[in-house]
Every structure is written in structure tokens, then in C-alpha cells.
Amino acid sequence: MSVTDELLANNARYAESFHGPLPLPPSKHVAVVACMDARIDVYRVLGLQEGEAHVIRNAGGVVTDDGIRSLAISQRLLGTTRSSWSTTPTAGC
């Protein structure tokens, strides 16, 4: 089985047991900018559940022009507040 096939099968299993629908705006009104480090599960690290936050990931966990665009949409259209933005850089990234 290819990695793509495995991911598609995992997605199908997830969809079968998904307890939704969840509203599009995050329930905790928080947006997190995080490093794309595959070792880090941002939701678990921060104690978040599905639907509670927007997680925006990129190399270095820094706010770039693209990050600003994503944060602006998160705030203006989907209700996160500026004071709740957080960055979670990791060591050795």
C-alpha cells in the first residue's frame, strides 16, 4: 500500500467516526502560528480539541506575509481575536 493509499484509508476511517458538524469559527477564538515540525502535535501540546483553534503552520513558526493573510482571515471572517494569537516555535527547527 502506498503512503497515499494509507492516508486515504485513514481519512475514510476518520470520516466514519467524525462527530460533527463543527462550526467553522474556532470555539476558543484562538489562532496559533506554529512550526511545521512533524514531531509536534500542536493540538495535543496545547490541550486543544478539534474545532477549538486555527493552527497555521510554516517553516520556523514565524509570521510571514502569508501568515498575516491567514491570521487576517481568521480574525476578520472567523472570529479569532488578536490578543489570542500565539506562536509556538520549537528548538532545533
What are these regions (language model features)?
Residues 51-93:
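Short HxH-centered metal-ligating active-site micro-motif
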